[in-house]
Amino acid sequence: MIRTYGLTHIALAVRDPERSLEFYRAVFGVTEYYRDADTIQVQGPGPHDVLAFEKMPDIAGNAGGIIHFGFRLTRPQDIQAAMETVERAGGVVTSHGEFAPGVPYAYVRDPDGYEIEIWYE
């Protein structure tokens, strides 16, 4: 086993890094911390949550075997507001419900088509 600090980032091929920044900022409150000509990196709500939006329009949205990635809510009652925020920001809610009583979830897609699970544990 190798010792690591954990998963450090996820890089997504996107059509428009600026549009991805706007979506993830509106929905998840990410903050930009690095930018170059074709990439924007953002810090998520967790101390080590990093997403990189890399301009690669030819393969944008092609998850290559990755089914989804997730964000965990701090309160279960926020699931409805989360779904509404996704739709206002240009995303799509694909399904929602409860894994168990009081354990809500929603699967959504960002503007490039990546599936995101929003849930409470």
Residue spans for each PLM region:
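Core segments of cupin and vicinal oxygen chelate
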Residues: Y5, A11-E54
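Acetyl-CoA-dependent GNAT
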Residues: E54-D58, Y120-E121
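Short beta-strand micro-motifs in enzyme catalytic cores
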Residues: I40, D49, I67, G102-A106
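Conserved segment of winged-helix/HTH DNA-binding domains
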Residues: D49-L51, I59-N62
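Vicinal oxygen chelate
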Residues: M1-R3, L7-R15, A60-E121
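Short, flexible, solvent-exposed loop/turn segments with mixed acidic/basic and small polar residues
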Residues: M1, P57-A60
